[in-house]
Amino acid sequence: MGKFCLYFCLIYILFSASSGNPSRCTLFIGASSYHSDPCGSDHPRCTWRLDLFSLTRDQSLSPPCPDLVTYSQYHRPYSLYVFPHWITKPNRRGLGYYSASYSDPCAIQCPYLGCQSWTCPYTGPVSSPHWKYSSDLNFTQEVSSISLHLHFSKCGSSFSFLLDAPGYDPVWFLSSQATQAPPTPAPLIQDSDLQHILEPSIPWSSKILNLILLTLKSSNYSCMVCVDRSSLSSWHVLYDPLKAPNPPDPKAQSILRPSLAIPASNVTPPFPWTHCYRPLLQAISSEHCNNSVVLPPFSLSPLPNVSRPRKRRAVPIAIWLVSALAAGTGIAGGVTGSLSLASSKSLLREVDQDIDHLTQAIVKNHDNILRVAQYAAQNRRGLDLLFWEQGGLCKAIQEQCCFLNISNTHVSVLQERPPLEKRVITGWGLNWDLGLSQWAREALQTGITLLALFLLLIVVGPCVIRQLQALPSRLQHRSQPYSLLNYETNL
C-alpha cells in the first residue's frame, strides 16, 4: 500500500509539472525586459522580435559601463549587420544574412574601449562553453529589426550584439533568464458575442465599435486587438469628447479621433474605461485604472462609384489602311535599328573591358582603405590605453569622438553586376551574332531585309497593278471626248 501511494504521488507530481504554466526566456537590457514566445524542454526554440532603436533607448537609461557611448545617431543612416560578439568573422552572403562558426564568448570589461567585429581585445578569459550557430543561436535582420532564436538550454547566460563596422562597434549588452508565463485567466468573450460582428448586413462602423467593446472585455492573451509595446509612442487615445471630428472627407465617418486627452469626469464616455493595458503583463487588465484604450486612428470612407463600361465603336477603314502602312514602315525601321545595334557589339566589348579594369582598381583601393582603417583603429585603442585613467582619448582631449564606417555593399554590388554586353543585348531580336561567321550574319541580314521588302510589295502591289490596268481605258476615254452623229451629212 505504501509503494502504491508513493507511485501515485510521483505520477501526480510529474503530471502537474508537465501541465503547469508554460515557461519562456526573458532578455534584460538596462531596466527593460523582453519576453520570448513560450518555450521549454518540449519546445526548446525561444524567439524574440526586437527593435534596435528601442534596445538603444533602454540601454541608455541604465548602461552596463558608466562611459559607454550611445550610437543612436551613428547607425541610423546605415544598414545594420548585427551578430553576437563571440562569432568569428563571417562570410557575408547577400545583404544581411550570415553563415558563421562560433568560438567561445568573451567576458565584458569596463570601461568598454570598443573592438573589431571579429576579435575581442581587452576582455577577460573564456567563461562559456562552445555554441553552435544552427541549433543554439541564429537570427535574421532587416534594417533596424531583428528576429532572434535562442536554444532554451542557453537561456541564463549573457551575450552582446555588435554592429559590423571597423573601429568602435555599437554594442548592446543583454542577459537572459528562464521565467514562467503568468497564469491565463478564463476568456470573458463568448462565441455568441461575435455573431453581431459576423453578420454581413451590419454596417462596418457598428462592427468596429462592437469589436472595440469586446476587446475591452477581453483580459486573456488571445485578445482580439494586440498591442505592441515598441509602438505605443506613436499611437493615440481612443475617445475625446472635447474635440469634434474633422475628417478630410465630408462623407467619411470618424471612428477613432487622434487625441491625447482623457475624457472629462462629468461626461459619460461611450465605452467602459475600467479596462487598461498593462505593459508588464502585456495584456488588457480588468482592474480599475485611469488611462484610456490605445488604438491607431483611422476613418471609414465610402467606395467611389464604379465607372460605366465604355461602348465599343467601329474603327474606320482608313485607320486600318494607315495602320498597315505604319506597320510596314515600323518593320523596316526595326530591321535597320537592329542591324545598327549588331554592328556596335565590338564597341560594347571594349567598353566592358574598360569597366572591368576600373572595377578592379576600385576594389583594390577599397581594400587599402580597409587596411588603413584597421591601422587607425589599433592606434586609437593604443591611445585609449595610454589615457585609461582619464577615461580614454576623447575624454582626455575633451573632443567629440569620431567613428569611421566603411560600407562594403556598393563594392559587392559592383562586383556582382553582369557584363555590359549581357545587360544591353539580351534577346534574339537584338542579337544578330548567334555564334555565326561574318558572311553568315550578312546573308541573314540581307535575307531579312528582302523579306521585309517582299511583304511591303505584297501589301502595296495589288493596288499598283489595278491602277496600271485601268490606265489605258482612261487614256482612250480622254482622246475621243465627242463622237460623230452621221458621216454622210454635214450636220
UniProtKB/Swiss-Prot annotation:
Region Fusion peptide: start-end pairs: 314-334
Annotated SUPFAM superfamilies: Virus ectodomain
Disulfide bonds: C223-C226, C223-C402, C394-C401
Lipid-bearing positions (S-palmitoyl cysteine): C463
Site (Cleavage): R313, A314
Gene Ontology biological process terms in this record: fusion of virus membrane with host plasma membrane; symbiont entry into host cell; virion attachment to host cell
Motif (CXXC): 223-226
Comment field on protein domains: The 17 amino acids long immunosuppressive region is present in many retroviral envelope proteins. Synthetic peptides derived from this relatively conserved sequence inhibit immune function in vitro and in vivo.
Native species: Human T-cell leukemia virus 3 (strain 2026ND) (HTLV-3)
Motif CX6CC per UniProt: ranges: 394-402
Extracellular side of membrane: 21-444
GO cellular component: host cell plasma membrane; membrane; viral envelope; virion membrane
Name used for this protein in its record: Envelope glycoprotein gp63
Region Immunosuppression, residue ranges: 377-393
Glycosylation sites: N138, N220, N290, N305, N405
Subunit-level organization: The mature envelope protein (Env) consists of a trimer of SU-TM heterodimers attached by a labile interchain disulfide bond.
Functional description taken from the UniProt entry: The surface protein (SU) attaches the virus to the host cell by binding to its receptor. This interaction triggers the refolding of the transmembrane protein (TM) and is thought to activate its fusogenic potential by unmasking its fusion peptide. Fusion occurs at the host cell plasma membrane.
Cytoplasmic-facing ranges: 466-491
InterPro entries: TLV/ENV_coat_polyprotein
Listed transmembrane segments: 445-465
Highest taxon listed in the record's lineage: Viruses
Coiled-coil regions listed in the entry: 342-388, 398-430
Protein keywords: Cleavage on pair of basic residues, Coiled coil, Disulfide bond, Fusion of virus membrane with host cell membrane, Fusion of virus membrane with host membrane, Glycoprotein, Host cell membrane, Host membrane, Host-virus interaction, Lipoprotein, Membrane, Palmitate, Signal, Transmembrane, Transmembrane helix, Viral attachment to host cell, Viral envelope protein, Viral penetration into host cytoplasm, Virion, Virus entry into host cell
Record note on modification: Specific enzymatic cleavages in vivo yield mature proteins. Envelope glycoproteins are synthesized as an inactive precursor that is N-glycosylated and processed likely by host cell furin or by a furin-like protease in the Golgi to yield the mature SU and TM proteins. The cleavage site between SU and TM requires the minimal sequence [KR]-X-[KR]-R.
Cleaved signal peptide residues: 1-20
Gene: env
